[in-house]
Amino acid sequence: MLSINMDDVMQVVSNIQNYLIAFGVVLVLALLVMFAARKMPKAKKKMIRAQSGLAILLALAIVVNLICTGPMSTMLDLVSGEGSISEETSAEATELVNEITQEGIVLAQNDDNILPVASGSKLNVFGWASTSPCYGGTGSGALNDAYPVTDLLTGLHDAGIETNDELSKFYTDYCSTRPSVGMAQQDWTLPEPNVSLYTDEMMANAKAYSDTAMVVITRVGGEGADLPTDMSAVVDGSWVRRVTDYRGSQRGAGYYNGTYDDTLNEGNDWDKGDHFLQLSNREEELIDLVTSNFDNVIVVYNGANAFEMDWVKNYPQIKGVLLCPGTGQSGFEGFGRVVAGEVNPSGRTADTYAADLTASPWWNNFGDFKYTNATELDSDSSFFDPAGATASFVNYAEGIYVGYKFYETAADEGLIDYDKEVVYPFGYGLSYTTFTQKMSDITSDGSSLKFSVTVTNTGSVAGKDVVEIYNDPPYTNGGIEKASANLLDFAKTSELAPGESETIDFTIPVEDLASYDYKNNGCYVLEAGDYIISTNSDSHNVLDSKTYTVASDIVYNESNKRESDAVAATNQFDFAEGEITYLSRADGFANYAEATAAPAAYEMSDEVKAGFENCFTYTESGYEKDEDANAEDITTGAKNGLKLADLRGVDYHDSKWDDLLDEMSIDDLQQTIGFGGYQTAAVDSIGKVRTNDCDGPASINNNFTGVGSVGFPAATLIGMTWSKDLAHDFGDSIGKMANEMNTSGWYGPAMNIHRTAFSGRNFEYYSEDGVLSGAMAANAIAGAQEHGVYAYMKHFALNDQEGNRTSMLATWSNEQAIREIYLKPFEMSVKDADCHAVMSSFNYIGSRWAGGCKELLQNVLRGEWGFLGFVETDYFGVYGYMTADQGVRNGSDLMLCTTGNDFNKMTVLTNSSKQAMRTSAKNILYTVVNSRAYEAENLNPGMAKWKIVLIGADVVAALLIVGLEYTAIKNYKKRKEEEEEV
């Protein structure tokens, strides 16, 4: 999959324009000289014109060389990369895709055992999406077009199930391709045929074909735009935000540039206020049609964004429901195996499926919110997407009550009727068999809790079960906020035969029961009281439980840090709290209406404005804030005889690192830091080789060579396996394929939170829960690292929506939610998997860009968690707020930039900033030298092919110029002699 980023194209033009201007000047001067020589004697005229032509040719050769070895060298390195994936490795990955799919699909309903459908049976498959299903998403998490996909119907056929060809032909004839949802523009059209097009003959044929029907409903999201919350606005065009771009042209802003072709469906697909995650009118009419003709109906929801499914209960004919996010390249093979009963489903939901998403606590605080009084912060530099020119915001007003943590707690407090509000709980899933779970007594040494859970298959077929361990902590009214259900750990059994049992041991650190008290103690606190530790079938239903009692409060402050921390976790994000009311459990969520209301003000306070930082406010005053007045100048250009390879395996704190860094020049440091777009740069002075880094969360794809891997299922589907082993296998497969592609860095896994169901990139992220997300991500990272591949955990942090993501998006949240919800997966990835690479995020945390937030990148990531490695920015576009000066001074090390721009290098070189550059270079070098790039068999890759080609072209050009010059001189002498004879 070869992709072209228009930001890069525009930047290339910008970077080479001076070279082109210089060549243009030479060209004009040469032409003027040629013109001036027109009246001279023939020999002299010809000679002057020949020399002018040769000057043009020489200038062209020089300019081409300067461009290739200068601003274009990085891009040429990227496009000339080598490496490919073997057929054997691709075949292994393909089968793993199928395994993940078949273990992640959730059997949500199975009345009258309608599933499995016996192999050899016939099935009517309704819904246009059955012929154009969702395989993944768009953007960095997209699949590689070089590999064929297995579609849904083929998956059924390969499992021995026949399907109605008349129906599938009807759908493909109606519309053969799925409308595109991209970063610059989104077509949200659902081309579901009008029910009037289903003829009586077609329905009669279907009933004669089979008495069972399957209906497929699909939703697709992608990078760059969230799913619409108002489809009627998309249809009438008011969803599109018009902007004037840098050329003065009007166009739709990327985030809100969605369209809908309602003429396909006779202009009646959505009612006012409908959103994208509910049935369209056409889909509802299709459900009516199918259920009025068939008594045995199976519904398949094919999408990673939790869909409103409350309508299912209104149709007694619907007896089976399957939840199946994007399956990757071949995963519908696994889907067919589940439907046919070849595999017993064991997936569990990774999100809560709410009956009414508009009643969710985040509904009013998700979307497009622009500050109205901050025009002085506007950036005319954001010309690639003019929507980014104005500061925006989002309020995480629900605090820690995200997903099931709200619904379970709100039900316990009497705020909601759980059965009316929740269709499928978090962690929910059925099986073709039945299980029991029995929990042992808890033992504790004061540091950890130990117990076991015995799972027994009490049904008639083999299957796997999931053990989910939750904590219901003691809560004091008005005290530290606590949800009544909190996932602590989980495990998946092996396949158990009927009557077979398996015992799983758990060790839970006592510190995992603590809550973050940002208001009083400013640290984690484990309050005295009874903690109910339970094994559940899902977040709502307890199977067995035990009580663990804490005798007195334990405060994890500076003098009593948590065992897992390098230094105590203390308040770092007071500045991100903002001036909003946060949802509280106090008095039964008495402030629910106030806290969850839409923002009352769109004005930025003077205090926030004074501290708001972008490229144009982070100037010398900002530098001074981040300066160390006592910093000493650095040593450069030393001759210590070290090369980077000599430091493989050397401890990060060893003094040899200082000796190596002393050898680097300022230019070396700038190159190392400034050019991290899909690579780390070569540094000749220390023998550092260039390494390749590749996207993305679902595969490993080189966007410059087009070489890539098999695409894996959406991360949500991986999360729905609830299998740490499969997550590890996924990372292992990515690492193996990356190694064959000569790739050392993987831009994944992504582990942001499904704060809402409408985030466009939910398919890239695992879950609404931090522990489930963290366990899956940590295992994937560990698997990749076994092949020497450094995995970039991303997007760090609070990057939970696409709308306005590069529009200086100020994300306001209290510290408890930041730590317990949004940072949790990253914390687990560092502590449990020893991750060594991070990709930060586009958004702001409060008033500070995440990539320039010292509290996040230095104090928490490196200080508290003990992270050793480097932090790379997200794509370093010209958005008006990303700058190496701020990033490097505050913990970012590498700019995700391929061609260079005005801000990807340090511009103010003080002792303090040079020390920061040196530290950034060390962080990068430490990670790279301990990666596969410095394994013996991968060193000495030789000269890049493009350089060999350039040298060859230079030799040819030199010979040509010499030959032409010789000919010109020879002809001049001949003409001169002829003129003299005359």
Where are these regions (language model features)?
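Short beta-strand elements
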Residues: 541-561
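Glycoside hydrolase catalytic-domain context in secreted enzymes
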Residues: 1-518, 524-539, 561-982
